[in-house]
């Protein structure tokens, strides 16, 4: 799974996704991409599940790029622990995905295969998405 090698701080603020994405809104590598419509927090496990689903559908042909990286540590308190006594320990990593952000890109397969692969990847993600093409 994706995780940062080094971090400046162990814990991060919860934060919100408030604005549209300014960078990463156009296709840079592939001919087909998966663009977010909602703003949401996507975990490293969800990204990995989407990657596996897409590569399995493509039968390991072509190329897949992941354009988001989970660098936000999400902390959680253990089960049945009372409120207070500080913030919990980091459990997993996530990324805040803004509306308009390209998350996955595909190149080197036919359009119907690419669309099917991106639909399968989209089903694994908590954000609403749409498929974009390079010639649009």
From Swiss-Prot:
Gene Ontology MF, one: rRNA binding
Taxonomy, superkingdom: Bacteria
GO-annotated cellular components: cytosolic large ribosomal subunit
InterPro entries: Ribosomal_uL16 (IPR047873), Ribosomal_uL16_bact-type (IPR000114), Ribosomal_uL16_CS (IPR020798), Ribosomal_uL16_dom (IPR016180), Ribosomal_uL16_sf (IPR036920)
Alphabetized UniProt keyword annotations: Ribonucleoprotein, Ribosomal protein, RNA-binding, rRNA-binding, tRNA-binding
UniProt keyword annotation of Cell membrane present: no
Pfam families: Ribosomal_L16
BP GO annotations: translation
Cystine residue pairs: none
Family from the record: Belongs to the universal ribosomal protein uL16 family.
Subunit structure: Part of the 50S ribosomal subunit.
Function: Binds 23S rRNA and is also seen to make contacts with the A and possibly P site tRNAs.
Record-given protein name: Large ribosomal subunit protein uL16
Organism: Rickettsia bellii (strain OSU 85-389)
Lineage, broadest ranks: Bacteria, Pseudomonadati, Pseudomonadota, Alphaproteobacteria, Rickettsiales
